[in-house]
Amino acid sequence: MMFFAPLFGQKYYDDQWKKVSDNYKTGKYKSNLPIILEIQKQAMKDENINQLIRSLKAEFSISNQTYDDGDNDATSRFFKKLSTFGETLKGDQKLVYQVLLGEFFWDYYQNNSWEINQRTNFDNQDFAQIETWSKLDFKNFLIKNFSILNAEKDHLKKIKT
């Protein structure tokens, strides 16, 4: 019976992602958010880090495409959500999460570098407000993240995805 659980679980995820894909094709981006949040919930329950990260990326993409960020803090709220997920993970999942967290920050920097590179560096930067980070803040965060991962490189090599 345990052998079928992963197959059943994967079918659930495949079916949900197919719904998401179909909605994208028909322009129903916002309709995907409840599906994606349900995938996140199930992934947390199943401890399926790959599906969790995929759903988080999709949520971030939908939020950026469909919501007006009048307070200019949507990204900060999303990264706060990411950090709360990180607190619940352990072992290999935590390391994979750490890799993907760095990737999120790098992608955000790459997509917004034209604006970020114009900001002045401050000593008292509010690190909870990613929208105000300077190039130096991103550099410092990514160096710290890379150092954490570099210390675990032997362990990372053994992780099977």
Placement of each model-derived feature along the sequence:
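Bacterial Sec-dependent N-terminal signal peptides
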Residues: 1-16
